[in-house]
Amino acid sequence: RSLKSHNAKRRATAVWERGCPRGCTFCSHNGMSRIDLQNIYGDGNRKDGEKLVRISDKENDTFQLPARWPSPQYAVDNIKLLKEKYDIDFVAIVDENMTSNLKWTKEFCGLYVKEGLNESVPWGTLGDAPSVATKPEIIKIMKDAGCDYISFGFESASNKVLNEDIQKGQLRSHLQKTLDTLKQEKMTPLTTFMIGNPHENIDDLMETVDFWIQ
């Protein structure tokens, strides 16, 4: 109840991100992208299709699904319009990669403060643990720009499950670092988990339970 989003009277939702750079096994982004790659770009061959539209990461010898965003100015102008026309007092930005798209998010936050929206229209969004673990300064930047919460899909605290089933590129150490950073910035952590993953046993589940308790 301390979150401003719970007290908002005129709440809006915004989404600007198209696609996702991650390949999480359980997510509809991944499933739909694979179908599109196969049907449109790969001439029936999914791997050939992936190579055509994925961004090569030569250091890690992997591919990432591309994602697209409008300009930060466009996003801020959207929220200004919603404030002026509908008098919103909170906006939920449901883009999933605001903590990893650092350049975009920093520019967005700067413009948001410049327009005074950080005081009149607080906001919340989604993020990912690996990016916060490596670039924790993004949390303070977002908080200073009016960000009230960031929801993270932790999924599991078992490295085995994270590696074999989730395949998001995150480890338990990333989860802990993210929580530590949020606590330092006095932001309430919002996290989601899944149980019943294909390779998960009771020991893996208890790792996650122990993580919750700690």
Task: Show where each model-derived region lies.
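Glycine-rich phosphate-binding active-site loops on the catalytic face of alpha/beta enzymes
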Residues: 214
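Short alpha-helix in the alpha/beta-hydrolase fold that links the catalytic acid
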Residues: 204-208
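Radical SAM [4Fe-4S] cluster-binding motif and immediate context
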Residues: 2-190, 197, 210
